[in-house]
């Protein structure tokens, strides 16, 4: 059992869109928990205050049973294990997922995807429904900036998760001097298409200086270029993230272009998806829309 079993740094009821999940139970709330530390060494970490810290000598303890009780009391429809890398709390997560499944709550991970196939199989068997995987860059960038990490293991997680029925969305924090070059972005977009499918959403999100990295914030034109690259690669759904109100934060039908989901920040202003289809042309819209 891990030493941080049940050690909690943060608890919050969040819109599922904040994870971000845009094609998984939109408009619902996920009761979200984080612990401490990380298995990556990214110098730009946006959650560095918990991911780069060891747990206190006496951390707050939340049992899986209490977490499920808090989830239901918050009015949330599901759980999310996030904020820091959830696989560091594997045993606790497995206990939470099993309890949540019995209570008809959905289960999500926000993860860097660096886990063994055996760990992912345990998670899916326990009730993991969805993962947002942080794809930090191409192989060169990830190895250089994330302390020797092999990005192929992250792609393997995406493929295995998809094959086991897990809903997958992928996020790339677009960072100047790290992964903002056209070649890097195109390689990610093309790998999404080839490895997990063109219908998997890709979130290209704005970076802001944090922790030990002082590159300037992501220019808007870079994010919009990333969006175009994703579409050119054949992705059906590409989103510009961390820019509330941007037109590319909305969902459009890949068949006819109809605006299907209009977002205002993390709120859903309109959702026209019906039975997983566009009401205008009948084209399927990949996702979990229950």
Residue ranges and their predicted role:
Residues 178-290:
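Auxiliary Fe-S-binding modules of radical SAM enzymes
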Residues 72-99, 142-155, 172-187, 193-194:
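Conserved glycine-rich "GG(E/T)P / GGGxP" loop and the immediately following alpha-helix
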Residues 70-71, 100, 123, 161, ...:
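Generic structural signal for hydrophobic
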Residues 51-52, 86-88, 113-119, 129-148, ...:
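Conserved radical SAM core fold
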Residues 74, 126, 164, 195-197, ...:
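Structural motif
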Residues 78-80, 106-108, 130-132, 167-169, ...:
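Structural preference for beta-strand elements that scaffold enzyme active sites
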Residues 94-104, 156-163, 220-231:
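Alpha-helix-loop-beta-strand connector modules within alpha/beta enzyme cores
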Residues 1-130:
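Conserved Radical SAM active-site core
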